[in-house]
Amino acid sequence: MGRKWANIVAKKTAKDGANSKVYAKFGVEIYVAAKQGEPDPESNSALKFVLDRAKQAQVPKHVIDKAIDKAKGNTDETFVEGRYEGFGPNGSMIIVDTLTSNVNRTAANVRTAYGKNGGNMGASGSVSYLFDKKGVIVFAGDDADTVFEQLLEADVDVDDVEAEEGTITVYTAPTDLHKGIQALRDNGVEEFQVTELEMIPQSEVVLEGDDLETFEKLIDALESDDDVQKVYHNVADF
């Protein structure tokens, strides 16, 4: 699974980096975190968390600085979080998390993306009950047992620790993600490939042929919306 998370980040960065959409989305997230607290990551843990993730996604420094400078200014632009759940082809399920300054615009855009690309937007809660919210931490390593013991000693609520091909993947309770990251830093981990709150599907489906092609177009349409921050799904090996 560790390779899965690292591959997802690499794939998304490569795809979005060409048109800078990932940078713009991080810019909004950084602005919101800085605006809601101090614009200093040393005194604002939410901002520090976003900046760490931005670093993993290779967001340029000038994008980060611009977002923080904007938060320091007198702008009163506000953003609202949203979630839209729906269905793709052949049993696939999708959760879309948004951060927007115009809820009506975003809701219409997401609904259109579903409808025009082989999907259907469902009611709130129609999909999310089949996913579990977890903290995911990925870094280089191969001793899962030692990592598990270190996290337990730090009183971190750990669901699982996996080691695969030189990569460690840690799953924590969502409330203990930051605590887990700090515990690993205290034990010498300096670089992380992934530090995210994720919605993990309780089971996965395999898509092939036309279904897979339709699903890929649907995900691309959803992720291309500027207000969409995260897209979760239950399709294996995608």
From Swiss-Prot:
One GO term in the molecular function aspect is: DNA binding
Please state where this protein is localized: Cytoplasm
Cite the Gene3D superfamilies for this sequence. 1.10.10.200, 3.30.70.980
Among the GO biological process terms of this entry, one is: regulation of DNA-templated transcription
Q: Which GO terms describe its cellular component?
A: cytosol
Q: Which UniProt keywords apply?
A: Cytoplasm, DNA-binding, Transcription, Transcription regulation
* Transmembrane segment boundaries: none
Main localization (coarse):
cytoplasm
Q: Which family does it belong to?
A: Belongs to the TACO1 family. YeeN subfamily.
What PANTHER family would the database entry show? TRANSLATIONAL ACTIVATOR OF CYTOCHROME C OXIDASE 1
Known HAMAP family for this protein?
Transcrip_reg_TACO1 (MF_00693), Transcrip_reg_TACO1_YeeN (MF_00918)
Q: What is this protein called?
A: Probable transcriptional regulatory protein SAG1645
